[in-house]
């Protein structure tokens, strides 16, 4: 199977170079707004590619404010293998470090209903974080079921199912260097 046939049902929405430019711009904004001793909480699995690029962009952008983030991961599940939200969020794997008294930046792939990020934010708040901000690569407007917004947004996208750059459909397509859309049933 060639790469072209493997991806015949994926339409490119945002190219790799557009993503790179936007991640750099986001990092430049983030370093002016947040303290250098950040705790980054990356929500797995969808945000691992975005987080990996964002922390390096933060390093490059943060020469002046001396940013030195710590990174931790939490696996939350709300979708399972389907493309429709099950409505409840569960911790599949928890953080390894305490967030008490820390300035936390939660990083996620996409803000849709807002259930995942509401759950993560409330949990981290309950655990005594000093401050909490949210950065998402993508957001879909008009889909929110919870009153939550991200402080830093990469791209606002139409109401289609996005894959690539860490985002999946049935745990496939995460490796794509661009963001594409697929038809889901
Ligand atoms: P929310 O809880 O509905 O805001 O959805 C957040 C989670 O659902 C994200 O972290 C993704 O894992 C998943 N999700 C929502 N929309 C998409 C999409 O278009 N493509 C891939 N995953 C998505
Ligand atoms: Mg996710």
PLM features per residue range, with description:
Residues 1-185:
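PRPP-associated nucleotide enzymes
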């Amino acid at each position: 199977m060639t790469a072209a046939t493997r991806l015949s049902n994926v339409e490119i929405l945002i190219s790799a170079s557009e993503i790179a430019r936007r991640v750099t711009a986001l990092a430049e904004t983030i370093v002016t707004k947040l303290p250098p001793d950040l705790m980054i909480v990356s929500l797995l699995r969808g945000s691992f590619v975005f987080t990996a690029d964002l922390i390096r962009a933060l390093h490059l952008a943060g020469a002046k404010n001396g940013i030195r983030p710590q990174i931790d991961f939490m696996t939350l599940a709300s979708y399972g293998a389907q493309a429709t939200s099950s409505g409840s969020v569960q911790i599949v794997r928890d953080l390894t470090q305490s967030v008490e008294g820390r300035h936390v930046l939660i990083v996620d792939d996409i803000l849709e209903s807002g259930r995942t990020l509401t759950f993560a934010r409330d949990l981290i708040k309950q655990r005594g974080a000093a401050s909490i901000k949210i950065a998402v690569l993508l957001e879909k407007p008009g889909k929110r079921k919870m009153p939550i917004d991200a402080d830093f947004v990469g791209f606002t996208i139409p109401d289609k199912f996005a894959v690539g750059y860490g985002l999946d459909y049935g745990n496939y397509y995460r490796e794509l260097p661009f963001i594409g859309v697929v038809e889901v049933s």
